[in-house]
């Protein structure tokens, strides 16, 4: 290849690199949190909260079932709730 062709190719590659770096910066700016450990910890915290709420709800359903002299499964069926939800 001639020197001018190589220089032209280098110039095109530099432009492509700048475009890719710009795209990367745009993508990184859209991320709410770039720290994976922090994201995982937030998900774990949310799962703990979900489990606490679910446990309370199941306890309350158990109390209602006891009061109505039926099973929790019967209450789930009555209200159209899948027991695994």
UniProtKB/Swiss-Prot annotation:
Domain of life assignment: Eukaryota
Keywords: DNA damage, DNA repair
Pfam families per record: Swi5
Function, as annotated: Required for normal mating-type switching. Also involved in the rhp51-dependent recombination DNA repair pathway.
Family: Belongs to the SWI5/SAE3 family.
PANTHER family assigned: DNA REPAIR PROTEIN SWI5 HOMOLOG
Name listed for the protein in its UniProt record: Mating-type switching protein swi5
Name of the encoding gene: swi5
């Amino acid at each position: 290849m001639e020197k001018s062709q190589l220089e032209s190719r280098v110039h095109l590659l530099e432009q492509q690199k700048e475009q890719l770096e710009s795209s990367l910066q745009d993508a990184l700016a859209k991320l709410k949190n770039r720290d994976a450990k922090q994201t995982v910890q937030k998900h774990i915290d949310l799962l703990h909260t979900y489990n606490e709420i679910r446990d309370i709800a199941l306890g309350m359903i158990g109390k209602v079932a006891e009061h109505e002299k039926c099973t929790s499964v019967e209450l789930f069926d009555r209200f159209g709730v899948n027991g695994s939800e």
